[in-house]
């Protein structure tokens, strides 16, 4: 990318505004702290509501000999009444005008139910509003949110969603069957299409389709094509990668007019660079007992987030109509 191309991209005006309802951390990266910056970098205006505000994230990592979690987490959780009041203020001032709604971590049932009300109202006001939902519930066979969220996602949220980005565990919970193979995955994706979701991206976790060297994700557009993406498995698991992935997906689906194959490929290219940079930085640190050194190197990866590099290691295959 030349300097002139970079400047032109940074100066480009985009008539896009996202309402992002996710978690927030003061230190480090998770939820809105991961999602807002990539969107703004690409010229999207972002209004964000923090479902929770914590001192730091509470997630697990797997890297080097580091402690898997921060020892302490402090903060507050937004209630459904407080969400209602915030949205009421936007509505009364007639500033609830959004091209996209993005949702991620939600800590309780009534808050998620209120999100459904907000999305319904926004879609009633503007039928072209795109709702992108990451149905955050758990991973690797276990929940890290209340299980009671699942039926709310299944019955209230999914029928409203235009784009859904579950991992394999979440996909299985939403459709009632475990996802172990590619065939399981594609069957479950079709069930989500039948419920009205136009685009489904299964971000990770289809164990039968993975190897020690590579991972896979899948993307499907209702009534169109299904794609398989194979890419290198990098060392380490870092908190916030899913939130970053989904925000970049918002960008590239919009930029490429819904071309999910190219959009996901660009997202994966940026994510590979981000994870490599995070991993390299962590290995160079002297204090190997510091949990904080494995926070995503999001700011330092801004060029790769803005302009995904060509990555020959990402293989894209069309596997269905």
Swiss-Prot record:
It catalyses: pyridoxal + ATP = pyridoxal 5'-phosphate + ADP + H(+). Its EC number is 2.7.1.35. GO terms for biological process: pyridoxal 5'-phosphate salvage. Substrate binds at residues 23, 144, 243. Its cofactor is Zn(2+); Mg(2+). It is an enzyme of class 2 (transferase). It comes from the Eukaryota. Coiled coil: none annotated. Transmembrane segments: none annotated. InterPro entries: PfkB_dom, PyrdxlKinase, Ribokinase-like. Divalent metal cations. Zn(2+) is more efficient than Mg(2+). Keywords: ATP-binding, Kinase, Metal-binding, Nucleotide-binding, Transferase, Zinc. SUPFAM superfamilies: Ribokinase-like (SSF53613). ATP binds at residues 203-204, 230-242. One of its GO terms (molecular function) is pyridoxal kinase activity. PANTHER family: PYRIDOXAL KINASE. NCBIfam families: pyridox_kin. Required for synthesis of pyridoxal-5-phosphate from vitamin B6. This is Putative pyridoxal kinase. It comes from Caenorhabditis elegans.
């Amino acid at each position: 990318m030349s300097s002139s191309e970079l400047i032109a991209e940074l100066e480009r005006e985009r008539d896009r505004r996202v309402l992002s309802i996710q978690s927030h951390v003061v230190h480090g990266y998770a939820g809105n702290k991961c999602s807002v910056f990539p969107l703004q970098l690409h010229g999207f205006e972002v209004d964000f509501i923090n479902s929770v505000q914590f001192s730091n994230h509470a997630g697990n990592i797997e890297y080097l000999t580091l402690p898997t979690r921060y020892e302490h987490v402090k903060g507050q959780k937004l209630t459904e009444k407080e969400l209602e009041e915030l949205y009421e203020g936007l509505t009364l001032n007639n500033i609830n005008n959004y091209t996209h709604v993005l949702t991620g971590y939600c800590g309780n049932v009534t808050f998620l139910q209120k999100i459904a009300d907000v999305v319904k109202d926004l879609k009633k006001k503007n039928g072209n509003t795109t709702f992108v939902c990451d149905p955050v519930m758990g991973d690797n066979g276990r929940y890290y949110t209340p299980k009671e969220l699942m039926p709310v996602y299944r019955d209230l949220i999914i029928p409203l969603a235009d784009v859904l980005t579950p991992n394999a565990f979440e996909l299985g919970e939403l459709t009632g069957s475990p996802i172990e193979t590619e065939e399981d995955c594609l069957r479950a994706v079709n069930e989500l299409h039948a419920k009205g979701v136009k685009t489904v991206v299964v971000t990770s976790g289809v164990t039968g389709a993975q190897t020690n060297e590579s991972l896979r994700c899948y993307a499907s557009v209702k009534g169109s094509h299904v794609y398989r993406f194979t890419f290198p498995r990098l060392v380490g698991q870092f908190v916030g990668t899913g939130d970053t992935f989904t925000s970049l997906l918002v960008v590239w689906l919009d930029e490429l007019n819904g071309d999910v194959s190219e959009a996901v490929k660009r997202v994966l290219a940026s994510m590979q660079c981000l994870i490599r940079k995070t991993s390299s930085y962590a290995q160079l640190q002297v204090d190997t007992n510091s949990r904080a050194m494995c926070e995503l190197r999001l700011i330092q990866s801004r060029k790769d987030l803005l302009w995904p590099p060509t990555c020959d290691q990402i293989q894209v295959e069309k596997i269905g109509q």
